């Protein structure tokens, strides 16, 4: 399969690109240049690997979920344990890389957006480590849902700005963070949290997250002497999935499954299933599939999981859907909750609600596969942050 994206203009087929105001163009070009240089620099790679190993705690285990496998009665189920990273999710793979890039570019300050708070915490964490000033924008609805993470960020020295505009969720936080970056661009780096935004962000985030798929490949081959037959990951903006899928894109014998949030159901207004129900448009500097109405107004996305309710999806996922290399599915709030409880009870591992969507789809897929086949789930984060809202949800039900 001939797959080499993005092109030199930052396009993935028709998707991606740089739809930014003139005031930002210079900055994204400067970032692209700095990133290319860093990727060629052995000292930078060495420093990044040092922090990934000794600070983040990589490599993360590839765990054979024996009880889940028996329960499903089909393929062997493996979990790639990104929940065991420092700060409890895959987000730090990217923030540590981008923060080192910010230092390299001589920036003193970092701005970021956050939904569930995981990216915010991971950003505040690396800023504390590297002595960078940190400003985090978070929708007020998410601030309410994720009080603990807000407190964590503040403990780490970050300034958390609550965003009341729009629906008060991730999309609005990205808007404000981009605005802030425009006016502080001389001394500030924007750490985009997912494979979104203008080029080179989707590529940078994908490359820093690819450590997930690269490790998985190596670990699975060591255990089974072959590649897995299937790989499953959840998708909001799509960074854990892109990090898991990208190293497998050329291995066409490996089926790749992306799992979006169907919320209350894709037949309702309350979902975040962009690739299932969306259409093409431009948001936050990039062309991608979006949830929008006939007039092109962005619709509100809904999911029980704060990390999946983004109304768009990374441009590379948009392309991978069109060319059929990844098949995209969606899982409802209720199915995700069921999977959350099942994994907790069967394996003693409490997954994030985001990751529970991937687990839920794997539970449907595994029984249809043969016993000598393997299925890897990217367990993108731990569920500590969700226990409170799940308790509330279950009491209401």
Curated annotation (Swiss-Prot):
Pathway: Amino-acid biosynthesis; L-tryptophan biosynthesis; L-tryptophan from chorismate: step 5/5. It comes from the Bacteria. Pfam families: PALP. GO terms for cellular component: cytoplasm. Gene3D superfamilies: 3.40.50.1100. Disulfide bonds: none annotated. Its EC number is 4.2.1.20. The modification N6-(pyridoxal phosphate)lysine is found at residue 91. Its cofactor is pyridoxal 5'-phosphate. It catalyses: (1S,2R)-1-C-(indol-3-yl)glycerol 3-phosphate + L-serine = D-glyceraldehyde 3-phosphate + L-tryptophan + H2O. Keywords: Amino-acid biosynthesis, Aromatic amino acid biosynthesis, Lyase, Pyridoxal phosphate, Tryptophan biosynthesis. The keyword Transmembrane does not apply. InterPro entries: Trp_synth_b_CS, Trp_synth_beta, Trp_synth_beta/beta-like, TrpB-like_PALP, TrpB-like_PALP_sf. It is an enzyme of class 4 (lyase). Tetramer of two alpha and two beta chains. The beta subunit is responsible for the synthesis of L-tryptophan from indole and L-serine. PANTHER family: TRYPTOPHAN SYNTHASE, TRYPTOPHAN SYNTHASE-RELATED. This is Tryptophan synthase beta chain. It comes from Bacillus cereus (strain G9842). The lineage of its organism: Bacteria, Bacillati, Bacillota, Bacilli, Bacillales.
């Amino acid at each position: 399969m001939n797959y080499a994206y993005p092109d030199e203009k930052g396009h993935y087929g028709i998707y991606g690109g740089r739809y930014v105001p003139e005031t930002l163009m210079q900055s994204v070009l400067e970032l692209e240049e700095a990133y290319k240089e860093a990727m060629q620099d052995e000292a930078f790679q060495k420093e990044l690997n040092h922090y990934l190993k000794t600070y983040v705690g990589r490599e993360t285990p590839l765990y054979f979920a024996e009880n889940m496998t028996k329960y499903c009665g089909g393929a062997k189920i493996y979990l790639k344990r990104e929940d065991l990273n420092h700060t409890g999710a895959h987000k730090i793979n990217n923030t540590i890389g981008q923060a080192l890039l910010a230092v390299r570019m001589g920036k003193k300050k970092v701005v970021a957006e956050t939904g569930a708070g995981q990216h915010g915490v991971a950003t505040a964490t690396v800023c504390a480590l590297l002595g960078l000033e940190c400003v985090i924008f978070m929708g007020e609805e998410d601030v309410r849902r994720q009080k603990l993470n807000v407190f964590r960020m503040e403990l780490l020295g970050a300034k958390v700005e609550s965003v009341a505009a729009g629906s008060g969720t991730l999309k609005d936080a990205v808007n404000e963070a981009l605005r802030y970056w425009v006016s502080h661009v001389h001394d500030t780096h924007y750490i985009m949290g997912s494979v979104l935004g203008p080029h080179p962000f989707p590529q940078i985030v994908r490359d820093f997250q690819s450590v997930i798929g690269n490790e998985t490949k190596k670990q699975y081959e060591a255990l089974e002497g072959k590649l897995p037959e299937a790989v499953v990951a959840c998708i909001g903006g799509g960074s854990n999935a892109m990090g898991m899928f990208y190293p497998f894109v050329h291995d066409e014998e490996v089926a790749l499954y992306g799992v979006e949030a169907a919320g209350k159901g894709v037949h309702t207004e309350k979902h975040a299933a962009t690739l299932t129900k969306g259409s093409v448009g431009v948001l936050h500097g990039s062309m991608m599939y979006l949830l929008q109405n006939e007039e092109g107004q962005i619709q509100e996305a809904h999911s029980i999981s704060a990390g999946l309710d983004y109304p768009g999806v990374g441009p590379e996922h948009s392309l991978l859907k069109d060319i059929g290399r990844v098949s995209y599915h969606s899982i409802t709030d209720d199915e995700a909750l069921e999977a959350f409880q099942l994994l907790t009870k069967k394996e003693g591992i409490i997954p994030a609600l985001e990751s529970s969507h991937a687990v839920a789809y794997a539970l449907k897929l595994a029984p249809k596969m043969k016993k000598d086949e393997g299925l890897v789930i990217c367990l993108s984060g731990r569920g500590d942050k969700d226990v409170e809202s799940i308790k509330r949800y279950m009491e209401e039900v």
